[in-house]
Amino acid sequence: MTELKLIHIFTDGSCLGNPGPGGYGIVMNYKGHTKEMSDGFALTTNNRMELLAPIVALEALKEPCKVILTSDSQYMRQGITTWIHGWKKKGWMTSNRTPVKNVDLWKRLDKAAQLHHIDWRWVKGHAGHAENERCDQLARAAAEASPTQIDEGYQADS
């Protein structure tokens, strides 16, 4: 069996107004090579962008990989490592029996994560972590670029 490639992924989401124009930023490192990705949406939320960033990064991988995925979003990290198990058992309902917010993205993240061996890590935002700061710059620039793309899953109450 061949050993899986080790990819370091850093992600961040940004939203101006929350809801408002938003964007995500991604930095991917593999064997000294760096790839950056970002995109923006006309109307979305910070949490949706924090979820979309790792989705896009994981979906960009062309084969199963060992991934160290670092984000400053406790919402995303706690959701994918802890809360999601209960949500799935309860038919995507919370412990309060209300529908899980951003369920379209949670399902997509869950599916993308199944293909890889992921170590989900958290880093404090705006604390000088170089890759996280770069992701923040990419996400903010995407949000500030007057994006017109529609976030199809965004609902005003999410």
Curated annotation (Swiss-Prot):
Localization, UniProt: Cytoplasm
Binding positions (Mg(2+) 2): 12, 136
Cellular component terms (Gene Ontology): cytoplasm
InterPro entries the record matches: RNase_H (IPR050092), RNaseH-like_sf (IPR012337), RNaseH_domain (IPR002156), RNaseH_sf (IPR036397), RNaseHI (IPR022892)
Primary site of residence: cytoplasm
Keyword Hydrolase carried by entry: yes
Pfam families the record matches: RNase_H
Biological processes, Gene Ontology terms: DNA replication, removal of RNA primer
Top-rank taxon: Bacteria
Essential cofactor(s): Mg(2+)
Enzyme class: hydrolase
GO molecular function, one term: nucleic acid binding
Domain RNase H type-1 as annotated: residue spans: 3-144
Keywords: Cytoplasm, Endonuclease, Hydrolase, Magnesium, Metal-binding, Nuclease
SUPFAM superfamilies listed in its UniProt record: Ribonuclease H-like (SSF53098)
Recorded catalytic activity of this chain's protein: Endonucleolytic cleavage to 5'-phosphomonoester
EC number from the UniProt entry: 3.1.26.4
PROSITE patterns, per the entry: RNASE_H_1 (PS50879)
Binding site for Mg(2+) 1: 12, 50, 72
CDD domains, per the entry: RNase_HI_prokaryote_like
PANTHER family registered for this protein in UniProt: RIBONUCLEASE H1
Family assignment from sequence similarity: Belongs to the RNase H family.
Subunit structure: Monomer.
Described purpose of this protein according to its UniProt entry: Endonuclease that specifically degrades the RNA of RNA-DNA hybrids.
Protein name: Ribonuclease H
Species for this entry: Shewanella sp. (strain MR-7)
Lineage: Bacteria, Pseudomonadati, Pseudomonadota, Gammaproteobacteria, Alteromonadales
Gene: rnhA
